[in-house]
């Protein structure tokens, strides 16, 4: 697949109505997220034919172009450079067609319902957590390899090699560093995402990191142990931080409205912090604690129910398609706090296994030298490594039935992981977020050690592969080998 460069982005801009049609450009891990002024200007057929474009997703407030991991950020950076350097063209007289488009857009905006508002809220989580994901993956890999090395070379050894001990300790220290101060990073991103100043969010989040016990032997003592008679208990973890940062952004905007412009820099942040500190100590910390505990309890019990895990794994790709899968991230934090590992992630990762199995079934059924086989050859290796977009948007989703059987294959893998947990052996990721597919193997762990976690996860993938393959072979591979678009591509 071609590398993302200025030429590719120029083609994308042309297909979406040129630079003047782009109001805002951002990205998540796999998608270019655009806010367009007029979505009717998009040439979807031309857009889908551009190299690297795996698919498009339309929502009320965003036009998303699926590019895959490692490409979306580069694409957003190049596009923003082009947008900043482009000169706005003179606005011509509004035509009847243009006025009709404006009317249509206004009508669409007026029809937005609560579902749309919830979707917008959840998509902001991509802005909060996406910049942190490379760090999660990095510390997870280092911790996984360190634990693996520790169990092979040190555990049970009376006099372990000093150099190995130092190496293992060094590889583990990054995980401790990140998770010790992760709340501050999340507070910064959250307040910024919801329209406030990132630094205020970081300062508010730091209140959840500080210690309020003068006799504590660890942590950073804050200098106070009570707040006007209220005992301070910095619980609630990430849920409390998110609530505080989101509310803090709203408070900051309200304060800014009443502060004169010449005093904005001096007073707005100070007043915001004073208000939010009091609210955090009295209300958010206790409330966040209850919400965090409730969420942990719910998903711990759901993760141990095979039918519940089957539903989660089977529906996860739909959440990915609609861009609301980042809403699971606070749950990941809750499970890390409660269990010491993320037991939901391997369940959801089974969805990708079902896609791989379905694609292999289509490959078997497809004619030799067909375009479908060529598409699968290019997408199957990334799929095995946890990059599912090429398979989803290039192979299964356009043909509908294989996508459904792939989801059912993922559900079978989720059922297996849930059944093993129900029998007393839950497994999970050793970090909040990480890669899926085979790449996630070294990051798996359990209460019985890393090897057991890796074995259960690998077995779950095999179940998902086989189930997706068999279900697609029987129910999802009839009369779907060649799409009209494929025929056109072959003629060209």
Curated annotation (Swiss-Prot):
Chain segments annotated as transmembrane: 125-145, 167-187, 193-213, 227-247, 265-285, 311-331, 344-364, 378-398, 403-423, 450-470
Domain PTS EIIC type-1, first and last residues per copy: 123-487
One GO process term, biological-process aspect: phosphoenolpyruvate-dependent sugar phosphotransferase system
GO cellular component: plasma membrane
Pfam families the record matches: PTS_EIIB (PF00367), PTS_EIIC (PF02378)
Annotated keywords: Cell inner membrane, Cell membrane, Kinase, Membrane, Phosphotransferase system, Sugar transport, Transferase, Transmembrane, Transmembrane helix, Transport
Domain PTS EIIB type-1, first and last residues per copy: 1-89
Gene3D superfamilies assigned: Glucose permease domain IIB
PROSITE patterns: PTS_EIIB_TYPE_1, PTS_EIIB_TYPE_1_CYS, PTS_EIIC_TYPE_1
Reactions it catalyzes: N-acetyl-beta-D-muramate(out) + N(pros)-phospho-L-histidyl-[protein] = N-acetyl-beta-D-muramate 6-phosphate(in) + L-histidyl-[protein]
Membrane topology annotation: Multi-pass membrane protein
Keyword set includes Kinase: yes
EC numbers: 2.7.1.192
Coiled coil residues, start to end: none
Active site per the UniProt annotation: 28
Function: The phosphoenolpyruvate-dependent sugar phosphotransferase system (sugar PTS), a major carbohydrate active transport system, catalyzes the phosphorylation of incoming sugar substrates concomitantly with their translocation across the cell membrane. This system is involved in N-acetylmuramic acid (MurNAc) transport, yielding cytoplasmic MurNAc-6-P. Is also able to take up anhydro-N-acetylmuramic acid (anhMurNAc), but cannot phosphorylate the carbon 6, probably because of the 1,6-anhydro ring.
PANTHER family the record matches: PHOSPHOTRANSFERASE SYSTEM TRANSPORT PROTEIN, PTS SYSTEM N-ACETYLMURAMIC ACID-SPECIFIC EIIBC COMPONENT
Protein name: PTS system N-acetylmuramic acid-specific EIIBC component
UniProt source species: Photorhabdus laumondii subsp. laumondii (strain DSM 15139 / CIP 105565 / TT01) (Photorhabdus luminescens subsp. laumondii)
């Amino acid at each position: 697949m071609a590398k993302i460069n200025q030429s590719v982005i120029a083609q994308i801009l042309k297909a979406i109505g040129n630079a003047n049609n782009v109001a805002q450009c951002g990205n998540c891990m796999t998608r270019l997220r655009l806010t367009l002024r007029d979505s009717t200007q998009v040439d979807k057929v031309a857009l889908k034919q551009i190299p690297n474009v795996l698919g498009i997703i339309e929502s009320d407030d965003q036009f998303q172009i699926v590019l895959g991991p490692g490409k979306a950020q580069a694409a957003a950076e190049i596009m923003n450079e082009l947008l900043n350097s482009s000169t706005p063209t003179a606005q011509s007289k509004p035509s009847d067609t243009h006025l009709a488009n404006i009317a249509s857009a206004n009508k669409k905006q007026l029809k937005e319902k609560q579902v749309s508002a919830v979707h917008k809220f959840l998509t902001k989580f991509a802005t909060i957590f996406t910049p942190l994901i490379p760090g999660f993956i990095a510390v997870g890999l280092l911790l996984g390899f360190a634990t693996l090395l520790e169990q092979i070379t040190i555990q049970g050894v009376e006099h372990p090699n000093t150099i190995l001990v130092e190496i293992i300790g060094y590889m583990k220290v990054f995980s401790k560093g990140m998770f010790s101060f992760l709340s501050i990073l999340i507070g910064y991103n959250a307040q910024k995402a919801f329209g406030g100043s990132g630094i205020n969010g970081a300062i508010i989040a730091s209140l959840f990191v500080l210690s309020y016990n003068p006799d504590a032997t660890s942590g950073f003592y804050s200098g106070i142990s009570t707040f006007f008679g209220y005992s301070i208990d910095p619980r609630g973890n990430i849920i409390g931080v998110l609530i505080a940062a989101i509310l803090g952004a709203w408070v900051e905007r309200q304060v800014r409205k009443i502060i004169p412009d010449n005093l904005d820099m001096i007073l707005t942040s100070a007043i915001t912090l004073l208000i939010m500190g009091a609210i955090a100590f009295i209300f958010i910390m206790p409330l966040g604690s209850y919400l965090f505990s409730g969420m942990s309890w719910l998903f711990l019990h759901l993760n141990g129910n095979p039918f519940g895990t089957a539903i989660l794994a089977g529906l996860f790709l739909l959440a990915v398609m609609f861009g609301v899968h980042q809403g699971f991230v606070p749950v990941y934090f809750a499970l890390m706090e409660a269990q010491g590992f993320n037991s939901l992630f391997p369940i959801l990762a089974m969805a990708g296994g079902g896609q791989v199995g379905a694609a292999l079934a289509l490959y078997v059924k497809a004619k030799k030298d067909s375009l479908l086989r060529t598409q699968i050859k290019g997408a199957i290796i990334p799929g095995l490594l946890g990059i599912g977009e090429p398979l989803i948007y290039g192979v299964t989703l356009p043909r509908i039935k294989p996508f459904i059987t792939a989801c059912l294959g993922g559900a079978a893998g989720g059922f297996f992981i849930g059944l093993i947990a129900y029998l007393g052996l839950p497994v999970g990721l050793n970090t909040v977020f990480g890669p899926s597919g085979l790449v996630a193997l070294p990051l798996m762990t359990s209460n019985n050690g890393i090897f057991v976690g890796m074995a259960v996860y690998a077995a779950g993938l095999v179940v998902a592969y086989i189930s997706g393959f068999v279900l697609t072979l029987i129910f999802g591979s009839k009369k779907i080998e060649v799409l009209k678009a494929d025929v056109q591509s072959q003629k060209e």
